[in-house]
Design a protein with these regions (language model features):
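A short mid-domain helix/strand-loop element embedded in enzyme catalytic domains
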Residues: 10-44
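A long amphipathic alpha-helix within ATP-dependent nucleotide-binding catalytic cores
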Residues: 41-73
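Conserved metal-phosphate-binding beta-hairpin within the catalytic cores
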Residues: 72-98
Length: 175
């Protein structure tokens, strides 16, 4: 589909895309929702505010990350609604409900290595996903079995990627 639109793996989109999903039970994948489905669940005005909030969070994250050599390829932002409280619009309070802009919820790419048309090096959990789906793990996701424990070298390589993302974005090192 994207190839027909002139996009390759790793292509920069002209504008961010808002792709809402349901919250699935632990161990299952969230299911995509249409904007109409979101509007049906939370109402048109709340759906529009969630869209704006998600885009603002990504825009601010992109400002900080790009100034520090990181591309945020995508991110997940989870919201909840507190119907017992109102926000400044008089509607229900929308609450940021989970981590935001971390290597677990986003794909961070080094800008100096970005090259459309190929898989990108990353500072996120993709390394773990790649190992789990490799023959080295011996795991078949379709088996219904829990994934195997991660080898120390996979844990260390993942930790190093997360630390590099932190250090690039913040300009600080951790002891």
């Amino acid at each position: 589909m994207y190839k027909r639109q002139g996009l390759d793996d790793g292509s920069r989109l002209p504008v961010p895309i808002f792709t809402p999903t349901t919250k699935a039970p632990i161990g299952e994948h969230d299911e995509p929702m249409t904007i109409e489905q979101v509007q049906h669940v939370v109402g048109t005005q709340v759906a529009a505010r969630i869209d704006v909030l998600a885009r603002r969070i990504l825009a601010r994250g992109n400002e900080i990350a790009s100034a520090n050599g990181i591309i945020i390829a995508d991110t997940k932002v989870e919201f909840g609604i507190d119907r017992t409280r109102e926000d400044h619009t008089g509607g229900p309070l929308i609450v940021l409900a989970d981590e935001v802009l971390t290597p677990d919820s986003s794909r961070f790419w080094p800008a100096d290595q970005w090259q459309p048309g190929r898989a990108q090096p990353s500072f996120d959990k993709q390394y773990v996903r790649d190992w789990l789906t490799s023959s080295a793990s011996g795991w078949d996701r379709a088996s219904g079995e829990a994934p195997p424990p991660l080898p120390d070298e996979v844990v260390e390589a993942t930790r190093a990627r997360y630390m590099e993302a932190y250090e690039r974005i913040t300009g600080r090192t951790l002891p």
